[in-house]
Amino acid sequence: MLNRLITSHKSLITDRYKKLYDAYIGDYPILHQANKEAYKPDNRVVVNFAKYIVDTFNGFFIGVPIKVSSKKKEIDDYINLLDKYNDQDDNNAELSKICSVFGKGYELYFNDDYGNLGITYLDPREGFMVYDESTVQKPRYFVTYQIVDEVMCGYIYDKTYKYEFNDKGGLHVFDGVEHGFNDIPATEFIENEERMSIFESTYSLINAYNKAMSEKANDVDYFADAYLKILGPKLEESDLVHIRENRTINFESMDGSGDGIVVDFMSKPNADATQENLINRLERLIFQNSMVANINDENFGTSSGIALRYKLLSMSNLAKAKERKFTSGMNRRYRVLFSNAITHRSENDWLEVEYKFTQNYPANLLEEAQTAAQLSGIVSHETQLSFISAVEDTNAEMERIKKEDENDMVETENRIFQNNEDSQNDEQ
């Protein structure tokens, strides 16, 4: 069965994941088309919308790191230690990017060489999850493998053991060792329920855009190298040795008189307006179908407040949908991690973990401060502070305000006491 699963996974890599990754790094089909004749313009222009869409969306979705916390101090302290030890803010950002490129990604948990819990991310080319056939589709195995010196080697994880395998001299699966978790130490994170890349629905549009831009560049070269047409006089053979190189065409008049001489450039019909319309329409459709805002649009920078939020509404809705999927994955992350004995935590402590996602809107501190001020007396001070993007941690800010108020009160009491003493001294 393992051989069959790996063969199926390799086919998926070839048929789908390679295409998606190539698009992200700017390697599109137009770069691999057959070359045209040497004398014809043959530009290959690539506009990498796939990377722009992925990076722009993830900057909006997770550019502000996810705040993971718990109201129980001992759990909160451990989460902060665990996430800092594993550089989890960066891991989350990379995992989110992987999901946007491929439609899904994986996290793997392990005991590292220092006796601490390790967390790493994998893209779907490096492994796969096997689910059971129940209604809820629970994970049964996680498989990760690589090819080293033409030998495939990897690991299989179930709920208790980790098994090493390789195909040197045939497929061999070795005895398992306990991995220390009460469940499969891996989690699948998904971009959406369909596990589609964020730019997958626009892939054909991006290819069409690249083709249109390349043809437009070819037309520019064509007009720059237009043939000189000379009608009437007969040119000497020595002048026309290399017609294509010199780009000259000579048609001698029928009577050889040379009358009615015409000298101008030959050009094909100009389709510039049609090309521009096509390019502009393709660009609009790419952003419309991906639901990611084109923040480089000239009209985008002039928007503010509610108008800006309307322009980002589609991307905000997309981010909220991904937030729910990411939250599900993070719930499983901490449930599995807390099941390891070295954490000294209860497996159900993950129920006390809370997540705060902050969409990365351009900040207008003046508007935010005015909104917060207008809410005075209507909502709590903590809620007021949450409207100001410059305040990253409302609880910490409330503590600082409390300390400042206490210090101000002490200073006021000291001044009153000092003034009373001075008054008494003056009376004496």
Language-model segments: which ranges?
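Extended, helix-rich architectural segments
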Residues: M1-L117, F417, S423-Q428
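Short amphipathic alpha-helical segments
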Residues: K71-E74, D83-D87, N91, C99, ...
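A short, surface-exposed helix-loop junction/capping segment
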Residues: K73-N80, I261-D264, L312
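C-terminal charged interaction modules
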Residues: D90-N91, I98-V101, Y114-L117, F128, ...
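Short, charged/polar micro-motifs that form catalytic or ligand-binding hotspots
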Residues: K97, F265-E276, S316-E323, Q374-L375
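Extended, regular secondary-structure scaffolds
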Residues: S100-V101, Y106-R195
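Extended, charged amphipathic alpha-helical segments
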Residues: D175-A307
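C-terminal helix-loop subdomains that flank or include functional centers
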Residues: N246, M254-G256, R281-Q428
